[in-house]
C-alpha cells in the first residue's frame, strides 16, 4: 500500500544557485536526495505552480514549492539478533567490521540473516532510513569496514560523498602469481553477458578504477594494498582476474589453488581450506556527514588471512634461494 506525501515550502534566499534536487533535499531532510530526484523526474514537483522535471534547474530563492507524491512501502525486513563488530558509533553513523559469511542486504537466496537485519535489531530507529542506512556494500565473504548512516540526512550526504569520490576505501588482498610492480586497472565493468550473477570487464560497462601496490612478495603469490576510485560490484575481484592475478580462494573469478613446488603440508592444507576470496576492507576515510570532520578507521586482517600470509611467508623464507626473480 502506497503512502501519500504532500509537502509545501518556500525556497530560502540562502539557497540561491543551488540545484532544485539539492535545495529540496535540504528543505525536506526526511527524504533522501535520490528519492526527491525521482519525484522531480516523475513530474511530482511544482515550482510556483508549474511542473518542474529538471533536477539540475537552479533556484533563485523565494520560489513556492509543492510536492504531491506517493511512496511505495518497502519490503518489511525482520530485526534479528546477529552480532555486529562496532568499530565506531555516534548519533549519525556506525562503522562496522563485517565478518565473512555475512550478506549485507537481503536478496534472492538470502532473505534474512544479513547486516540489514542485524542493524534493525541493534538500532530500531534505523528502519526509517532507506536500506537501513546502508551506503555501500561488501561481498558476502569479503571482510572489513563499512559505514552505515543512522539518519536520512547522514545517508544523503554520505551517498553524495561516495558519488564525488570523497570516501577513501583501501583493501588488503592476496593475489595469485608474482607481480612485479603496482599499478592501476582502469577498465569498465558490467554484468557478465551469459552468467547473470557474475561481473566482467566490458567496453559498454560502467567506469571502474582500481589502484594497487605491492606489500609483500611470496614465491607464487603477492600481497597487495588496493584503493577503489569507484565501487562496482565485485570490482577488485574482476579487475585482478582481468590482469591474470585473481585473488586466492575466489570461487567465482579465481582458479584452482596451485601451491609452489616443494611446498610444505601446512602450506598446502592452509591454501586448500581457504575457501573465500582473500580480500579485506582494511581502511575507511571520510568526512563526517554532519560535522564535516575528516575521520579514519582501520581494521586488521582477520585470522584466516593472517594464517594464509604466515604460511606463504614461511614458505618463501625456506625456498628463497630457489626464487629466480630475486
Curated annotation (Swiss-Prot):
Its EC number is 5.4.99.23. It is an enzyme of class 5 (isomerase). The active site is at residue 139. Pfam families: PseudoU_synth_2 (PF00849), S4 (PF01479). One of its GO terms (cellular component) is cytosol. Residues 18-91 form the S4 RNA-binding domain. Transmembrane segments: none annotated. Disruption phenotype: Severe growth inhibition, makes only very small colonies. No longer synthesizes pseudouridine at positions 199, 1915 and 1917 in 23S rRNA. In this strain a miniTn10(cam) insertion has occurred; the first 196 residues are present followed by 12 extra residues before a premature stop codon. The keyword Lipoprotein does not apply. Changing residue 139 to N/T: Loss of activity. In late stage pre-50S ribosomal subunit interacts with ObgE and DarP(YjgA). This is Ribosomal large subunit pseudouridine synthase D. It comes from Escherichia coli (strain K12).
Amino acid at each position: 500500500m502506497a503512502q501519500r506525501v504532500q509537502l509545501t515550502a518556500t525556497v530560502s534566499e540562502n539557497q540561491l544557485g543551488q540545484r532544485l534536487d539539492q535545495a529540496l533535499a535540504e528543505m525536506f531532510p526526511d527524504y533522501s536526495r535520490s528519492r526527491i530526484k525521482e519525484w522531480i523526474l516523475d513530474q511530482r514537483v511544482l515550482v510556483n505552480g508549474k511542473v518542474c522535471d529538471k533536477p539540475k534547474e537552479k533556484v533563485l530563492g523565494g520560489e513556492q514549492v509543492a510536492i504531491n507524491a506517493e511512496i511505495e512501502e518497502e519490503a518489511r525486513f525482520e530485526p534479528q539478533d546477529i552480532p555486529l563488530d562496532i568499530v565506531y558509533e555516534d548519533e549519525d553513523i556506525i562503522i562496522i567490521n563485517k565478518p565473512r559469511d555475512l550478506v549485507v542486504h537481503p536478496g534472492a537466496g538470502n532473505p534474512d540473516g544479513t547486516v540489514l537485519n542485524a542493524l534493525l535489531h541493534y538500532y530500531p530507529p534505523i528502519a526509517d532510513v532507506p536500506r537501513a542506512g546502508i551506503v555501500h556494500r561488501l561481498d558476502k565473504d569479503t571482510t572489513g569496514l563499512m559505514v552505515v548512516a543512522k539518519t536520512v540526512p547522514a545517508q544523503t550526504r554520505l551517498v553524495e560523498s561516495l558519488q564525488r569520490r570523497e570516501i577513501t576505501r583501501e583493501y588488503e588482498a592476496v593475489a595469485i602469481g608474482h607481480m612485479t610492480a603496482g599499478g592501476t586497472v582502469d577498465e569498465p565493468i558490467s554484468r557478465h553477458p551469459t552468467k547473470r550473477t557474475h561481473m566482467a570487464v566490458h567496453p559498454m560497462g560502467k567506469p571502474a578504477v582500481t589502484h594497487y601496490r605491492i606489500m609483500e612478495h611470496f614465491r607464487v603469490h603477492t600481497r597487495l594494498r588496493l584503493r577503489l576510485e569507484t565501487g562496482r560490484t565485485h570490482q577488485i575481484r574482476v579487475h585482478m582476474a582481468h590482469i591474470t592475478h585473481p585473488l586466492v580462494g575466489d570461487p567465482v573469478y579465481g582458479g584452482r589453488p596451485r601451491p609452489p613446488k616443494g611446498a610444505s603440508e601446512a602450506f598446502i592444507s592452509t591454501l586448500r581450506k581457504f575457501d573465500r576470496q582473500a580480500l579485506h576492507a582494511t581502511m575507511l576515510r571520510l568526512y563526517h556527514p554532519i560535522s564535516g570532520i575528516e575521520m579514519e578507521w582501520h581494521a586488521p586482517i582477520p585470522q584466516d588471512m593472517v594464517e594464509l600470509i604466515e604460511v606463504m611467508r614461511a614458505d618463501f623464507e625456506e625456498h628463497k634461494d630457489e626464487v629466480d626473480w630475486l
